[in-house]
């Protein structure tokens, strides 16, 4: 969702592309060196997409994006069924740990029956230097760090579901690991 949001911002604010384009080589090299989960290169990209716009304008764009995204998001029945099963069990703590910014997650899924019943850990954004930046990039090993801050160590998790190999550091601590395929099917991981 985060990448889609930044593309959405650039489509709505095409002049920011003039700022983003010269930043892309720096961002690309930094991601190659530091890895895809690095915070500052993506923070620089977000800043380039949002620089020069008021907080009110950016909040409106965020809200507009959430409405647009809700119309295009595809629900995966198998994944929803598993989530519902865990929610109905009443003996599990359920965590949604996502690389998407928390305000986007909350706005896109605000009316779902499950959002109020899960614990959310997400990427955080804040205002700095005339735009938005990432104050926390919740991706890769950072997901482990953030969950350990909430529930302590050592992590012992029953099951984990992910659509990305970036989540393998967190899935390592799960007894049962599942990869969500692009078509919404579940593949059990070893």
Where are these regions (language model features)?
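Generic short alpha-helical segment signal, independent of protein family or function
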Residues: 10, 34, 50-54, 63
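Active-site neighborhood of HAD-like aspartate-dependent phosphohydrolases
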Residues: 1-34
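N-terminal short leaders/motifs
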Residues: 36-42, 116, 120
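A general alpha-helix detector
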Residues: 4-5, 42-45, 64
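Helix-loop "lid/cap" segments that line or gate small-molecule binding pockets
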Residues: 29-33, 41-52
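C-terminal cap/substrate-recognition subdomain and adjoining C-terminal extension
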Residues: 56-63, 67-190
């Amino acid at each position: 969702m985060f990448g889609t949001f930044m593309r959405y911002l650039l489509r709505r604010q095409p002049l920011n592309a003039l700022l983003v384009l010269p930043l892309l080589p720096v961002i690309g090299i930094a991601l190659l060196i530091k890895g895809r989960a690095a915070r500052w290169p993506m923070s620089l990209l977000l800043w380039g997409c949002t620089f020069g716009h008021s907080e009110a304008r950016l909040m409106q764009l965020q809200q507009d994006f959430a409405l647009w995204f809700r119309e295009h998001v595809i629900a995966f029945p198998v994944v929803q069924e598993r989530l519902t099963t865990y929610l109905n069990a009443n003996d599990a703590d359920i965590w949604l740990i996502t690389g998407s910014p928390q305000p986007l997650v909350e706005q896109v899924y605000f009316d779902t029956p499950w959002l109020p019943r899960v614990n959310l850990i997400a990427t955080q954004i804040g205002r700095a230097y005339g735009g938005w930046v990432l104050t926390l990039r919740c991706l890769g090993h950072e997901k482990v760090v953030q969950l350990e801050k909430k529930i302590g160590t050592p992590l012992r998790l029953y099951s984990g579901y992910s659509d990305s190999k970036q989540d393998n550091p967190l899935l390592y601590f799960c007894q049962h690991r599942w990869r969500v395929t692009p078509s919404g099917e579940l593949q059990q991981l070893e």
